[in-house]
């Protein structure tokens, strides 16, 4: 399910659920190489559709008599993430979230030098998606699709921390551990997002993603509580990644429990 390419200083986690077993996604340290630029485009496009679909469900629900409903909004977020993981996860890793990228880098599973470029691509995708929605729903139909705390700042911070911790813990489990059932990675990750939106949506808007909050905030010029959505998800994701590293413990070498090729390739080789 994940490509885990070893390097001298850091490794890159790439979600891979395709049937192409002849090629393995290789790490590229060059910031101007074609493969790396392809990854950036995949991250920008993936983040665009994640934010467009998720935030569109909020705006449409607000403008059209709650036809989507709150559970429907949660399902939209979960489904779009699931689809995107299977679509471009094997190209860029399917982060779509600066918190995920930073967390992987903190555990040396993603090249630190590539983090700024990934974050910029993710923010660009979010801003473009938010701008598209504002153009589509101008005038009386214009709705702020960002995230604002509905309780205290402390309550919102703790919720965002816990939800992002949970999301990152699941991502690490299905994307970096060779013992996981890789074909269900997208479903597991999307389902986790869906659950978090249902639980935390009424309290914080269930961001779990600095890009998800910053894009709409930038387009609408509304920054209430934005620091919560920039800080809490990053701290939560880093904590989730490190805790999974602790519970991953096995008597096998790390190289045998982290994925070195696609799940399907490893499975075929074992037959």
Curated annotation (Swiss-Prot):
GO function term, MF aspect, one: channel activity
Coiled coil: none
Family: Belongs to the MIP/aquaporin (TC 1.A.8) family. NIP (TC 1.A.8.12) subfamily.
KW Transmembrane helix (keyword) present: yes
Cell location: Symbiosome, Peribacteroid membrane
A biological process term (GO) from this entry: nodulation
Chloroplast among keywords: no
Task performed by this protein: Aquaporins facilitate the transport of water and small neutral solutes across cell membranes. This aquaporin may function in transporting small molecules across the peribacteroid membranes.
Domain of life: Eukaryota
Induction text: During nodulation in legume roots after Rhizobium infection.
Species this protein is from: Glycine max
Residue positions, PTM Phosphoserine: 262
Membrane topology annotation: Multi-pass membrane protein
Stated name of the protein: Nodulin-26
Keywords: Membrane, Nodulation, Phosphoprotein, Repeat, Transmembrane, Transmembrane helix, Transport
Motif (NPA 1): 97-99
Transmembrane segments: 40-62, 72-94, 115-137, 152-174, 181-203, 225-247
NCBIfam families associated with the record: MIP (TIGR00861)
Domain notes: Aquaporins contain two tandem repeats each containing three membrane-spanning domains and a pore-forming loop with the signature motif Asn-Pro-Ala (NPA).
Pfam assignment, any one: MIP
GO cellular component, one term: peribacteroid membrane
